[in-house]
A protein has these predicted regions:
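Charged, low-complexity surface segments at secondary-structure and domain boundaries
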Residues: 1-6, 46-50
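N-terminal charge/polar-biased segments
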Residues: 2-29, 35, 391-443
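Alpha/beta catalytic cores of nucleotide-metabolism and tRNA/nucleoside-modifying enzymes
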Residues: 3-7, 20, 178, 350-353, ...
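Alpha/beta enzyme core
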Residues: 21-71, 76-324, 328-330, 334-357, ...
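Conserved alpha/beta catalytic core and glycan-binding cleft of carbohydrate-active enzymes
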Residues: 339-428
Length: 443
């Protein structure tokens, strides 16, 4: 655990403590670092700040994917906003996924819309992680202020672990190192890195993907782990390979990649490779020792492919956890029947895929429902459509735990009324909820 300056152990004691933890803590079973405890201590500074949300989130997520989840696996979906993430917590999900695709499209600090090609500003995903955690904190403050305690039936643990998209690291190993630190400072529980060339990175379901050599991808995973160790947080690291579809690579020098070279080169100087299952397996096996979960991006939802990939990874790294993108880029009914769709996540879990997520569900939910209401409102009978499509369904959802019907309270009006009352000595004539339409009409 991080130590304050006046409680700090000597360098030698810190090194010994780290070495003991790495050797004896089951958390690090099967994890390869490629650096020493002395390296971590030398480069982390004399004062080690604590990163409570990242620390807790990583520990919770690790326990969930190792048997403590409700379903035997964690299923999440990409949140497009902090408020949407809060609703996920209220509805009973156990983790939040934060998609770089969605951040690129509708949530980046560049304040514009991009495709998933690493065009947005480097700080965008950490900023969204921070924003989600700030909203979780406010929701928890509101709940706590009402006297609801952990263990109470109505208590909600808002601090869901957030798994964030680091794309291809936005550069080399130093970029990945700094990005990982930024993610941890923002409170991310898990972070994933992919093996594409950052300069021409594409969505996993686009064409034109270029792989970096296997060793370079491993070094980015080492960089991410090193950053987490320097920060003193057991962040969950997910390694993603795009080798199922990517048929280009930057170099021909890596022995792990040479079996897949075709001998052809492109006008940009890239080497052509044979994409598919075998190339994916070679990468997954190579990444497994440096990651906590391994993920192979695929073009269709294929249990057979998932099984072969899992078996190969587990033959080399027994028990290694796996992750799967249940992507909206798949035409699900074109590939599977209703029964197969219904059992798909359970079937994946049985193969060891313990963190599963729908990358773009949040933005599809948001944009689809916005369009549906806007179309009815623009072309129909005005307020009838708001009442029938939004307000009445919201009222009906209260029995499931939905509370945004009382939207003033949801965002903290009652909490700040309480703050005002305390400051003004126990009474106030300017409280926001007193005399509000919400108080009069929604209770």
């Amino acid at each position: 655990m991080p130590q304050s300056l006046n409680q700090q152990l000597s360098r030698e004691q810190q090194i010994a403590a780290l070495e003991k933890d790495w050797a004896q803590n089951p958390r690090w079973k099967g994890v390869k670092r490629g650096y020493s405890a002395a390296d971590v201590v030398r480069l982390r500074g004399s004062l080690q700040p604590e990163h409570t949300l990242a620390q807790r989130g990583a520990e919770v997520l690790w326990n969930k994917i190792n048997g403590d989840s409700k379903k035997g696996y964690v299923n999440a979906f990409g949140a497009i906003s902090a408020g949407q993430a809060m609703q996920q917590a209220k509805a009973g999900l156990e983790a939040v996924y934060l998609s770089g695709w969605q951040v690129a499209a509708d949530g980046n600090t560049s304040e514009t819309m991009y495709p998933d090609q690493s065009l947005y500003a480097y700080d965008s995903v950490p900023t969204m992680v921070r924003r989600i955690n700030n909203t979780f904190k406010r929701a928890d403050e509101i709940q706590w202020g009402k006297g609801v305690n952990p263990g109470d039936k109505e208590f909600i643990d808002y601090f869901l672990p957030i798994v964030a998209d680091a794309e291809a690291g936005f550069g080399g190993v130093l970029n990945a190192f700094e990005l990982m630190k930024n993610m941890i400072q923002a409170g991310a529980a898990g972070v994933h890195f992919e093996d594409q060339l950052a300069a021409v990175k594409k969505c996993g379901h686009m064409g034109g993907k270029v792989l970096v050599p296997t060793r370079e991808a491993c070094e980015k995973l080492i960089s991410a782990r090193f950053a987490a160790d320097v920060m003193g947080v057991p962040t969950i690291i997910l390694a993603r390979t795009d080798a199922e579809a990517a048929n280009l690579i930057t170099s021909n020098h890596d022995a792990n990649d040479q079996a897949f070279l075709t001998g052809e080169r492109t006008q940009e100087g890239f080497y052509r490779v044979k994409n598919g299952l075998e190339q994916s397996i070679s990468r997954g096996v190579a990444y497994a020792p440096y990651a906590d979960l391994v993920w192979c991006e695929t073009g269709v939802p294929d249990i057979g492919f998932a099984r072969e990939f899992a078996q190969a990874v587990h033959a080399a790294s027994p028990g290694k956890l796996l992750s799967y993108n249940c992507s909206p880029s798949f035409n699900w009914k074109k590939n599977l029947n209703d029964s197969q769709i219904a059992s798909f996540q359970e079937d994946l879990s049985a193969l060891g895929y313990k963190f599963q997520f729908i990358t773009l569900a949040g933005i599809h939910i948001n944009w689809y429902n916005s369009f549906q209401f806007a179309h009815a409102y623009a072309n129909g009978e005005g307020m009838k459509h708001y009442v029938n499509m939004v307000q009445e369904p919201e009222f009906a959802a209260r029995e499931k735990g939905y509370t945004f019907v009382s939207h003033q309270q949801e965002v903290g009006a009652g909490y700040f009324d309480d703050v005002t009352t305390v400051i003004q000595g126990g009474s106030s004539s300017v409280k926001a909820l007193t005399g509000s339409t919400e108080e009069e009409q929604f209770h």
